[in-house]
Amino acid sequence: MAILSSALVTIDLPVTLVSLLVGSIFYFCYLTVYRLFLSPIAHFPGPKLAAWTYWYEFWYDVIAEPEYTFKIGRLHKIYGPVVRINPDEIHIADPDFYDTIYAGSGRKRDKWDWITRSFGVDESLIGTLKHDEHRVRRASLSPYFSKQSVRALQPLIDRNMAILLDRLREFAKSGSPLKLDDAYAALTNDIVEDYAFGRSDHRLEAPDFDPSFRDAMLQGGKAGHVLKHFTWLMDLLKKLPDSLLLKLSPAMGAYSQLQTSVKRQVAEIQHAHQMHTYDKTRRTIFHEILNSKLSDYDKSTDRLWQEGEVVVAAGTITTAWALGVSTYFVLATPDILRKLKTELEAAIPDPSQPLNLITLEALPFLTGVVQEGVRLSHAISHRLHRICPDETLIYQDNDNQREWRIPPGTPLSMTSNLVHHDERVFPDSHAFKPERWLDNARLERYLVSFGKGGRACLGINLAYAELYLTLAALFRVYGTEQVKGKDDVGTLQLFETSAADLVITSDTVVPVMPEDSKGLRVKVS
């Protein structure tokens, strides 16, 4: 009997291997035929290799550099405004079609799990796939990011801005170069953490402004390109301790440590809420969520830490980058600085008095500076995805006299970088020109750094408040050697920094400086 069993195993093993081989070949052939000829989007233009396999995107984002976002721009120059960029996805490059894809909450827009799963925050607002579930979760957070709520936050922003101005005076005394990109990340992080959790890590007070949170998020963005192709890897990494993960992958280790920190903060808030030991006079986002009518699951630690990570990350990185871009161009362009200081001096006669956000928002040139900073910082370097589950979208390609009918359920995307550098909308698009926004309200339609529609960035009002208040407070009392105001307390001079330091050279989801850049540095005097 044992001999017979051994013989059967000997016979079955080759048969099994052959069956697997034949099955694999059959599946490979079927997948090839389906993707290239039978898919509902098989007729859309684009490279056949991209239509056939996801390895095409993998090559540009993982093997070469995280640069598929730039390759997509080059593909549009070859194939036109509609391009199939992988087996399932259509990318559009037409600013006038943006509002159709990123429609308001009255039209259903889902997200694509192939993208959202790469961040490991599937239960957060940005990771919520279905339109209706997203709307419920968003409704629980929206009140805390309304214009009224954000204006009530001004004392918090002012306190942190005062700390930053104190730090500038320290650097003036020491003569050391100040890394403003780190300082701005510390500023925005301290503000959003305090609002979210009722406490902050006081990064503004750290000697080096403690850029660890920002750096961990950027490393997580790099890892995301790998993780979206290998979903099992995310599950494996979650099971490893941070100490081991740091050795295997410093990028993922730093990102995991960040998540551990956010989990701890959310757990502490939940414990204080259960024990009724939190300060009820302070209105913070996550204390209020626990008092909301959301389901018990939506209030669980497993979900709320993901929301916490997204709120803090989005509230830190994108606004800090926009501040950096704005500051560089203002300092590098004397005429812009002169016009800005003239406007600020007229609107703020006494710089020692608290700023008025409503007054600042009405200043046309300051608004132009803010809008150009937002436009050229892009906020998100990656394309934004949407799925229209129940409607066929029709794109009219007028240049080529072609109508494209995009089937329901097809992942669609556009990229802010391509919209903001469309020369038909923004002539001389790479130039920082605040005056392009003066008496030109139509341009606001094409400013898409924060997305649009029912899934637009929730923190847009907070971001704008920080931009207005920070730039006004800074340039009301600081000038340069070439441009000085009567009430200035010092000057800021760019130090070994050029426009090349602000060029986005890789896609880590959010913009990041070139690897050889030393940052946005200034000398304070």
From Swiss-Prot:
The chain crosses the membrane at residues 13-33. Gene3D superfamilies: Cytochrome P450. One of its GO terms (cellular component) is membrane. It is a single-pass membrane protein. Signal peptide: none annotated. Its cofactor is heme. GO terms for biological process: terpenoid biosynthetic process. One of its GO terms (molecular function) is iron ion binding. It is an enzyme of class 1 (oxidoreductase). Heme binds at residue 457. Its EC number is 1.-.-.-. Pfam families: p450 (PF00067). Keywords: Heme, Iron, Membrane, Metal-binding, Monooxygenase, Oxidoreductase, Transmembrane, Transmembrane helix. It comes from the Eukaryota. SUPFAM superfamilies: Cytochrome P450 (SSF48264). PANTHER family: CYTOCHROME P450, N-ACETYLTRYPTOPHAN 6-HYDROXYLASE IVOC-RELATED. Cytochrome P450 monooxygenase; part of the gene cluster that mediates the biosynthesis of terpestacin. The bifunctional terpene synthase tpcA converts isopentenyl diphosphate (IPP) and dimethylallyl diphosphate (DMAPP) into the sesterterpene preterpestacin I. The C-terminal prenyltransferase (PT) domain of tpcA catalyzes formation of GFPP, whereas the N-terminal terpene cyclase (TC) domain catalyzes the cyclization of GFPP into preterpestacin I. Belongs to the cytochrome P450 family. This is Cytochrome P450 monooxygenase tpcC. The gene is tpcC.
